[in-house]
């Protein structure tokens, strides 16, 4: 997003709009993301909603993440046409607002949902007994609803503003690439708005996610019991992959955004062309999520193989798998129950066996 001066877009803005790298890279990457993400997440959503067992908090978060990915992918065709058309928006003001809010709301929703998953896994591994009352479906649903309320509130200025801008020097109308100064009353308000988005929707979730996954991995690595070692290795590997994907996809884009905000508002320089290119990394996360679901859940793998006609999966196979995952996950429960006699009783409750995702 570029903020023009009072006389119109400056030379840096015009150069960005003429940049051939952006005109080629974004449509190509967005097309790839849409082609992989839409069928992949549609199938993932079908499996998560119709074919898997009891909906644990992890499954609820994965459903929300899959819906988020689908909504983001559904607006990419408009972005593809816009950039192929030399940044000329032809779909009107209302659709520009809808596409822009949907694009950024769903991108940040992915960040917040992955943060919720990391916290749920952190509590399940490090505090399996004391956190049991909080790791329930209703709290997961409330967390998803809360993230959407936060997002829509934070992005509400975009929904109330005409995000199109006529660039007469190029004979085009942009959508969200150039913003009007009149959108907010002062430079100070621009700074508050942009820094709030960066801190609230990225920096805090980023720190929480990195801290939770790091603590979870270290806890699993310190566990010495041989029972469930394979499941533990799988959980550690997946947590590391999810953390790497989170850092790789979302960190570059948001830190470049921070550099652009500071340089644009206070020094008159722009890194918006770099920011636009790093948006590709954020969108690539949509392609990775279906693979994360596959490796995260043994039941998801079995259902996929059944759907592809590899073999019919007996129900007792899934039940046995849940038993083995439960045994692997309760190593820390056993140690905690040793110190608290009533904890062993809690550890044998069927409610704890609901964990299937190894997020």
UniProtKB/Swiss-Prot annotation:
Keywords: Cell membrane, G-protein coupled receptor, Glycoprotein, Membrane, Receptor, Transducer, Transmembrane, Transmembrane helix
Stretches assigned to the Extracellular side: 1-19, 79-88, 160-187, 259-275
Outcome of mutating residue 164 to I: Loss of protein expression at the cell surface
Glycosylation sites: 5, 11
Alphabetized PANTHER family for the sequence: G-PROTEIN COUPLED RECEPTOR, P2Y PURINOCEPTOR 8
Other information: The gene coding for this protein is located in the pseudoautosomal region 1 (PAR1) of X and Y chromosomes.
Stated name of the protein: S-geranylgeranyl-glutathione receptor P2RY8
Organism encoding this protein: Homo sapiens
